Amino acid sequence: MNIYSVIKKPLITEKTTIEKDERNIISFVVSSDANKIEIKDAVKTLFNVDVASVKTVNVAGKVKRVGKNIGKRSNWKKAYVTLKEGSNVDFFEA
């Protein structure tokens, strides 16, 4: 898989910002068919950082209703990337 199609976007929330500051863990929304090795290589190449570990979570889409119509949001995959000591990604800085 192409490294530019592995990572879709960073996941920036209050919780992920705290994780970044306290434990040096950054979060990404990644392609559903990407594995941990591809995610690790993509983060290393795109951001020039050393990766310690990668954890992934498959997030199930919620069932939503608008009036009589029932639909389902898409499933997606989230990756928690732990960086080695001294590594930093700049887009999380304000």
Swiss-Prot record:
It comes from Geotalea uraniireducens (strain Rf4). GO terms for molecular function: rRNA binding; structural constituent of ribosome. Belongs to the universal ribosomal protein uL23 family. GO terms for cellular component: ribonucleoprotein complex; ribosome. One of its GO terms (biological process) is translation. Part of the 50S ribosomal subunit. Contacts protein L29, and trigger factor when it is bound to the ribosome. Pfam families: Ribosomal_L23 (PF00276). The keyword Mitochondrion does not apply. It comes from the Bacteria. One of the early assembly proteins it binds 23S rRNA. One of the proteins that surrounds the polypeptide exit tunnel on the outside of the ribosome. Forms the main docking site for trigger factor binding to the ribosome. This is Large ribosomal subunit protein uL23. InterPro entries: Nucleotide-bd_a/b_plait_sf, Ribosomal_uL23-like, Ribosomal_uL23/eL15/eS24_sf, Ribosomal_uL23_CS. Coiled coil: none annotated. Keywords: Ribonucleoprotein, Ribosomal protein, RNA-binding, rRNA-binding.
